[in-house]
Amino acid sequence: MVFRIASSPYTHNQRQTSRIMLLVLLAAVPGIAAQLWFFGWGTLVQILLASVSALLAEALVLKLRKQSVAATLKDNSALLTGLLLAVSIPPLAPWWMVVLGTVFAVIIAKQLYGGLGQNPFNPAMIGYVVLLISFPVQMTSWLPPHEIAVNIPGFIDAIQVIFSGHTASGGDMNTLRLGIDGISQATPLDTFKTSVRAGHSVEQIMQYPIYSGILAGAGWQWVNLAWLAGGVWLLWQKAIRWHIPLSFLVTLALCATLGWLFSPETLAAPQIHLLSGATMLGAFFILTDPVTASTTNRGRLMFGALAGLLVWLIRSFGGYPDGVAFAVLLANITVPLIDYYTRPRVYGHRKG
């Protein structure tokens, strides 16, 4: 009898990295479409800029490292990094910001560690945080959803603002950010945090046009539901596992509910947390990154729960209105520790 000796891994996933990345890119279509509908063509321009920047940055580093450029670019990971960063920033942010953030994400946060599979932090979120800390005004200058907007920029206007800072008619970001009440608009989370700190009551805040949505913030609720739809499709395709999204959303909802019940005059209701900002994008497309997330099922549950708790804490008590990016990176730090204490016991060996 002949015994074959094989080395690990002993189980194999037949799906290639490029196919998984492609599935994630396809799943992002509903979310992208929703952002285009509510915030205009700027999102598409940012995606194109980020995609080109990501591919060029990755190709440059691979060339310097004398590695195969074509083979690596085919894994679609650079495209996904650019896409996730592009949909996370305001649609009319200056062109150089998305280029800078994408190049930093690909070269510093990914390739500097050795490339795909070696980076401990989510590259897109590293790029986002670098931009947010460096350029806080531009990174929080979101347009009002078209439902409550006074000026809705077209495709040409979006290009002109992104590359020159103003439209052909002289309109700038201050003009484009005006809502139907004549006040510059912000995201639902940003508006809530700023208004509470200014001493406004929750009853007053909920009367603002940005909260005119059926469930949560105008426009943002549908954007989040679109990302949720894409995430459910990823689960159905088995491109991601359910542990991280579920534990993240349950923890965020639980913390938000308890906080709202105990302090309804200062803390946002759970539906605002779940359907505003980057909640669903983070739950299904960012936290589930197989490279930077936990690798065990118990670990994934802990990882998602930790991220959900951090998002609520940052949104409720921190200095930034959303907090998803910071929560992801802080949770990434804990992955080695989580994996160490949740790794399954080797058969035939005692626990401990």
Swiss-Prot record:
GO terms for cellular component: plasma membrane. It is a multi-pass membrane protein. The modification FMN phosphoryl threonine is found at T187. Its EC number is 7.-.-.-. InterPro entries: NqrB/RnfD, RnfD_bac. The complex is composed of six subunits: RsxA, RsxB, RsxC, RsxD, RsxE and RsxG. PANTHER family: ELECTRON TRANSPORT COMPLEX PROTEIN RNFD (PTHR30578), ION-TRANSLOCATING OXIDOREDUCTASE COMPLEX SUBUNIT D (PTHR30578:SF0). HAMAP family: RsxD_RnfD. This is Ion-translocating oxidoreductase complex subunit D. It comes from Shigella flexneri serotype 5b (strain 8401). The gene is rsxD.
